[in-house]
């Protein structure tokens, strides 16, 4: 049975959530009595902070480890994060500590890709396989066994199309042309681009603002670029002012939204796009407190004097807000898949097995009409732990 303990370190500078797994007996795998699967497999996982999105990923690292241990493995997920998303040096130190502890595999969601490279290079030198989640773009100067994630620019483009949909374009939201979508259909970038091949830009009209992450960093810039790339094609959409950086933080998201709400009245500012879930939930709270939140769920035409919230990530918390209509649409980044597939690939790497170089989450739109497909019970691929054990 998987035991969990909350560990706090670094005088409140670092926060750690440690999941300790104890392997069961199970049938012998292909390795026989001396099979690698019988030994403890430690996966050192470090997200950039401990907010809801990364807690969701950690939970699914643990759930996959529970399944592996039930099949006879002895997998331990050791999870530790910086206290804040801007504590780049702390995440570097965490990875270096994992190297010193000689964990079997390191999984990391970088707070900043450049900042962690020296620590990843140390892991490479020590022969410890590294999995990077939250992006697919290959990184120079380091060796990465597998990337689990998505193209951040594409994810933001998906969000941009959801905004266009709500304000007159074809799709599933607002008053534009309705597109029949089978339940199994992903509303990913490919679907949106095909849907908008013959869209009339003149039908789409809106104005809004952007809350970005940490200004100038890889993830924030990629998302800004992807969002703007789509919006620049539609003259009827106006982005007011410059983005405000909220450092992927909910409280700062509240402050950024309040700044925009004081600067523009709801009749001229129709929407807020926040580039992450925490900031989006903050923007939602600010608009709700001011009495201007659009809580229609996107099923009716936008109401004058209301501000619609669009964001990126998708967690159990934000999915509940989508169901309640308070977030119009959010782009799924696959946090459950990060953990679920991350543990699978980590165990396979510890067993000396090959894993895919990339696992694409395929960012896609979540809205009131399909929210039940995501949380509380995300649709995850089955893992054949018995086969992995037999080959270990």
Name each region found by the language model.
Residues 1-10:
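Bacterial N-terminal signal peptides that target proteins for export
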Residues 10-11, 230:
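Enrichment for repetitive, rod-forming helical segments
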Residues 22-392:
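A residue-level marker of the well-folded mature domains of exported/periplasmic proteins
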């Amino acid at each position: 049975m998987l035991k969990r303990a909350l560990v706090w370190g670094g005088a409140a500078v670092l926060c750690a959530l440690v999941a300790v797994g104890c392997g069961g007996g199970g049938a012998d795998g292909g390795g026989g009595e001396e099979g690698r699967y019988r030994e403890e497999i430690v996966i050192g996982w470090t997200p950039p902070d401990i907010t809801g999105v990364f807690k969701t990923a950690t939970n699914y690292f643990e759930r996959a480890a529970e399944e592996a241990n039930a099949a006879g493995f002895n997998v331990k997920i050791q999870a530790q994060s910086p206290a804040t998303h801007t504590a780049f040096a702390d995440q570097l130190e965490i990875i270096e500590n994992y190297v010193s502890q000689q964990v079997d595999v390191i999984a990391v969601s970088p707070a900043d890709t450049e900042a962690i490279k020296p620590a990843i290079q140390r892991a490479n030198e020590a022969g410890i396989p590294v999995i990077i989640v939250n992006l697919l773009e290959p990184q120079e100067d380091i060796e990465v066994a597998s990337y689990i994630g998505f193209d951040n620019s594409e994810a933001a483009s998906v969000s941009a199309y959801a905004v266009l949909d709500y304000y007159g374009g074809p799709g599933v939201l607002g008053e534009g042309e309705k597109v029949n979508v089978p339940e199994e259909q992903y509303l990913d970038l490919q679907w949106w681009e095909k849907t908008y091949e013959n869209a009339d830009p003149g039908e789409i009209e809106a104005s809004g603002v952007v809350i970005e992450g940490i200004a100038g960093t890889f993830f924030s810039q990629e998302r800004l670029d992807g969002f703007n790339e789509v919006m620049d094609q539609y003259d009827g959409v106006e982005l007011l002012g410059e983005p405000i950086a909220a450092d992927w933080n909910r409280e700062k998201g509240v402050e950024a939204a309040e700044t925009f709400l004081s600067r523009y009245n709801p009749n001229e500012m129709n929407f807020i796009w926040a580039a992450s879930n925490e900031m989006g939930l903050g923007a939602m709270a600010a608009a709700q407190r001011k009495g201007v939140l659009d809580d229609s769920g996107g099923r009716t035409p936008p109401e004058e004097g209301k501000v619609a919230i669009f964001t990126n990530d998708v967690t159990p918390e934000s999915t509940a807000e989508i169901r309640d209509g308070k977030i119009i649409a959010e782009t799924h980044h696959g946090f459950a898949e990060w953990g679920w597939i991350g543990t699978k690939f980590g165990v396979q790497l510890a067993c000396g097995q090959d894993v895919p170089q990339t696992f694409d989450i395929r960012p896609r739109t979540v809205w009131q009409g399909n929210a039940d497909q995501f949380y509380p019970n995300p649709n995850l691929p089955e893992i054949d732990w018995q086969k992995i054990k037999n080959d270990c």
